[in-house]
Amino acid sequence: MKRAAIAAAALALTGCSAADPEPTADGTVSQDTFLTTHGLAAMDAVEIIDHLDRQKVTERPTDLIASVRADELLLSSDDQEVVVDLPDNQTYVSIAPYLTSTHDCFYHSLTTCLGELDNEDIQVTITDEATGEVLVDEATTTFDNGFIGFWLPDDAT
C-alpha cells in the first residue's frame, strides 16, 4: 500500500539476434533464456531497469515491453513473458517533469513511455511525508526518454 502512495505521489510529477526461445505450453520461457535473447543476460531487476530507462530512445528495443510494477518487473515479447522480482524493501519511482501535458500512469514502461523534457537538467527533492526525511535532494538530468528514476525505501510515503 505504501508503494502505491509513493507511486501516486510520483504521478503528481509525471507526464508518466538470437533464435526465438521455445515457449512452454503456457507461453512462458525460462527467465535466463528470455533475458539472454533480449541482451539482458545476468542482469538483476535493478540493472535491467537502469539499462532500459537510460537507453537512447532511438536504441530502444521494439520487440520488448518492460513494465515496472509494485514488486516486480514484467518483461514481455510476442507471446512470451517473464517476471523479475524487485529488491526487497525498495521500490522504483520514475518521474517525468512536464510543461504542457501529462496522463494517468499506473506502471512505468521502460521501453515505450516518453516524457516531454528529455535530457534536461532538473532539481529533484523527494521527502517522506510521514517522517519528513529527505530521501532525494539532487540536481540531475532526465534520461533521453524524459524520465528520471529513483530507488526508494518501500515503506516511505
Predicted regions mapped to residue ranges:
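Hydrophobic helical h-region of N-terminal Sec-dependent signal peptides
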Residues: I6-A10
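Extracellular Ig-like/FN3 beta-sandwich strand-entry sites
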Residues: N119, D154-T157
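Bacterial signal peptide processing site
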Residues: S17-D20
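C-terminal motif of bacterial Sec signal peptides marking the signal peptidase cleavage site
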Residues: A12-G15
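Bacterial N-terminal signal peptides that target proteins for export
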Residues: M1-A5
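Short, acidic Ser/Thr/Gly-rich low-complexity loop/linker segments typical of extracellular
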Residues: T131-N145
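Glycine-centered loop-to-beta-strand initiation motif
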Residues: T142-F150, A156
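Short loop/turn and low-complexity linker motifs enriched in small/turn-promoting residues
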Residues: D32-Q123, T127-A130
